[in-house]
Design a protein with these regions (language model features):
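Extracytoplasmic thiol/disulfide redox context detector
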Residues: 1-58, 128, 170-176
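Solvent-exposed, acidic/flexible segments
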Residues: 11-12, 16, 22-30, 53-60, ...
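Sec/Tat-exported extracytoplasmic proteins
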Residues: 19-22, 33, 37-40, 67-71, ...
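Extracytoplasmic/secreted envelope proteins and their assembly/folding machinery
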Residues: 30-37, 60-64, 77, 94, ...
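Structural microenvironment flanking redox-active thiols in thiol-disulfide oxidoreductases
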Residues: 39-101
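C-terminal cap of thioredoxin/glutaredoxin-like
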Residues: 103-176
């Protein structure tokens, strides 16, 4: 069975990064992964999927989809990691995230309206379904082509997990 975040199209291979903004390992992996994404092969479609292991993860999960819905992932994704891990801001509720977004150029009302929208709720539900389908136990983690999974605990480091993902992408290209 294939588990995909979106329909990636014929000849394309999906790579999913499962993450959580408050995860220190995800924060440490983000610069490496962002660099990899910039150099990713043309046939690889990268999707970021925020996890929800517990109910209190939902606000950050929805925040990512607010950024995505408003075409602001490039502007806000790294900033949110920085605010949480470097500035030590507590950003785990909708009001706190909305106030932070407002200080970073996204009006609070627009953030909250989008946060509470049907579209963001649907994307958040789908993200949790993908997380469950891949049986994600921890983050960061990588899903390849809707059927392969790896993470740092399986490979000892996220650098190796990325190498495994590259190998699996090659296997998918070869039809395996």
């Amino acid at each position: 069975m294939l588990f995909r975040s979106t329909d990636v199209g014929a000849g394309k291979i999906e790579l999913i990064e499962f993450f959580w903004y408050s995860c220190p390992h995800c924060n440490a992996f983000e610069p490496q992964f962002a660099a990899w994404v910039k150099a990713a092969p043309k046939d690889v479609v990268v999707q970021r999927v925020p996890v929800r292991f517990r109910d209190d993860f939902e606000a950050q999960q929805r925040a990512y989809y607010v950024f995505e819905s408003l075409n602001m992932v490039d502007a806000m994704h790294g900033k949110l990691f920085h605010a949480i891990h470097t500035e030590r801001q507590q950003l785990s509720t909708a009001p706190a995230l909305a106030a932070w977004a407002n200080k970073n150029g996204l009006p609070e009302k627009k953030f909250l309206d989008t946060f509470n929208s049907f579209g963001v709720a649907t994307k958040a539900r789908r993200a949790t379904q993908l997380q469950d389908a891949f049986k994600v136990q921890g983050v960061p983690a990588l899903g390849v082509a809707g059927r392969f999974y790896t993470d740092g605990s399986l490979t000892q480091t996220m650098d190796r997990a990325l190498q495994v993902a590259e190998y699996l992408i090659g296997e998918v290209r070869r039809g395996r």
